[in-house]
Swiss-Prot record:
The active site is a conserved redox-active cysteine residue, the peroxidatic cysteine (C(P)), which makes the nucleophilic attack on the peroxide substrate. The peroxide oxidizes the C(P)-SH to cysteine sulfenic acid (C(P)-SOH), which then reacts with another cysteine residue, the resolving cysteine (C(R)), to form a disulfide bridge. The disulfide is subsequently reduced by an appropriate electron donor to complete the catalytic cycle. In this atypical 2-Cys peroxiredoxin, C(R) is present in the same subunit to form an intramolecular disulfide. It comes from Streptococcus mutans serotype c (strain ATCC 700610 / UA159). The keyword Protein transport does not apply. This is Thiol peroxidase. The lineage of its organism: Bacteria, Bacillati, Bacillota, Bacilli, Lactobacillales. Keywords: Antioxidant, Disulfide bond, Oxidoreductase, Peroxidase, Redox-active center. Signal peptide: none annotated. Pfam families: Redoxin (PF08534). Residues 16-161 form the Thioredoxin domain. Belongs to the peroxiredoxin family. Tpx subfamily. The active site is at C58 (cysteine sulfenic acid (-soh) intermediate). Disulfide bonds join C58-C92. Its EC number is 1.11.1.24. One of its GO terms (molecular function) is thioredoxin peroxidase activity. Gene3D superfamilies: Glutaredoxin (3.40.30.10).
Amino acid sequence: MTTFNGNTVTLAGKKLQVGDTAPDFSLTDTDLSKKTLADFAGQKKVISVVPSIDTGVCDAQTRRFNQELSDADNTVVITVSVDLPFAQARWCGAAGLNDAITLSDYYDYSFGKAYGLLINELHLLGRAVFVLDEDNKITYLEYLDEMTNHPNYDAALAAVK
């Protein structure tokens, strides 16, 4: 069962598993350009998915992964939400994380559907963390049952090392 603030919600799409190849995506960057997995080829990827970057847990999750992995070799942190790209850019500037990569699934929710994270009732993304190797194989993932909870940061960070 998946909940948001204690209320049961349903997620569109099929949940992924460790060992799966991550589905490609086309997401909107803060400059309105499109980004795909190919744009991050040859790098480890931490895909941090949040319902809205403007909420407390989402803010903390985005800061933590970006700060802790800022010096990690060959690793990129990608935060995904359905916030408009303008809101993501504003948040990055206010947070002092101007180099953070925030991508939006606002256009067609295709990422949310492909990764099993689109909350049907709210048209937001569920909270999750995916760690991908250089070949886009999922080496770690966490789908949170309660969307307002924090992910297991230590486990995700350990999976990157």
